[in-house]
Amino acid sequence: MKIGNALQGAGVGLALMLAATTAGQSADLGAKDEPIKLAMLEWTGAHVSTHIAGQLLEKLGYKVEYVTAGNFPQFSGLADGSLSASVEIWLNNVGDIYPKVLAAKQIEDIGKLDLKTQEGWIYPKFMEKVCPGLPDWNALNKPGCVQALATPETAPNGRFLDYPSDWGSRAATILADNNMPYTAVPSGSEGALVAELEAAEAAKTPLIMMFWGPHYALAENDVGWVTMPPCKQQTNDHCITPPDVDKIVWSGFGAKWPAAYTFLKTFKMDATEQQKLMLAVDKQGKDLDAVVKEWIDKNEAVWKPWVDGAKG
């Protein structure tokens, strides 16, 4: 009887330990039945980063929703919790809302994505004959160059192809700061930007435009980067420098989804890898989810430490 009681007691103790362990694991996941809402921004690189993060969060046991959001408007959603996280925030282009909600501690910056970036003004390389002196920005001010870039829409100014208006851009401000005779004309979308670059390359049509890397188009088109004019003020509104890219979450994220929070803090994106996936989606027409799943299947050595670390 004593032995039986001892075994029974041990069994109860083991059951309690297992229950406590299971409860601890559930607590680490937090509100796993409530979806984590990831911001889906306008550019393909962000789609890639976001879907890799999302599929890995699902491996951790979370439900994930992808919510379309504008680059500036997303910060209102992150501040009020209607968006949970955004994993590819280019800090040189965050607008006026971001610093306010960050200072108010409505959002939290959880670190670098480690994405090696480029941003600035590009041109097809044949433009160096149209505007002698490129890549020096002063070459753009020469009358012959301005005339070559002028269109009926912008004459007598040259046309500068800018980001879509809802992305936000500093190009118009920098042009004005330096009294450059150009009118910034917003593009309709990322696809329209790339299409115009490719058309200019094919037809040798003069073009100067705002662009960024990593991007698959940079691997397929011969472009130069303008050596930028001086900054009137050392701020994001008046300067273009290779930007840092951070990950941002709603301020309540860590308390609500602890393991997801740990995972996103360690999540990284390699620019070369991202560019390969963008090429597959944008040029080869492959499905985004399928491309991301294939990458995850082939790169367990990359992401497994992030997931294992989040499990604790």
Question: What is each stretch, according to the model?
Answer:
Residues 23-37, 57-58, 149-157, 302-312:
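Immediate post-signal peptide segment of exported/extracytoplasmic ligand-binding proteins
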Residues 32-36, 45, 166-183, 187-204, ...:
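An extracytoplasmic/periplasmic, membrane-proximal ligand-sensing/linker region
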Residues 50, 69-105, 196, 216-221:
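Pocket-flanking alpha-helical
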Residues 106-160:
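A conserved helix-loop-strand patch within extracytoplasmic ligand-binding domains
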Residues 118-130, 242-256, 280:
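A bilobed periplasmic-binding-protein/Venus flytrap-type ligand-binding module shared by bacterial periplasmic
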